[in-house]
């Protein structure tokens, strides 16, 4: 397979992964602030769908293409910037896995509240808080990965 084509797919995939994460987080966070169960239920459904379509596929493709590229380019996975990129990716993925479950729970709570004409219950806010708390280290991890991939060095390493 052509090296440039795989690099292109790797960059495109990382863009989809990061863009989907930022976009869905933005919309779910701000619609949640309205406390409008009907609006939240609609947006949460789309967020869950986008996560499965874009995030799940790219979270599988990224390490596969990255390891292939490193091997093809003769880079050891213990090269500091590559090693720490992998660590950051593992952290981000470890945050994402419970986030998926939380998003489905947020969706279900909002759908139930909207269907019964009730407000979002306190359980929604608790789940949203956990979702936000997990999103922060994932975001920082992805920003660090982008830096290391471009600079080919570890930030703050001197």
Model-derived regions: residue spans:
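Polytopic transmembrane helical bundles with strong interfacial aromatic enrichment
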Residues: 1-158
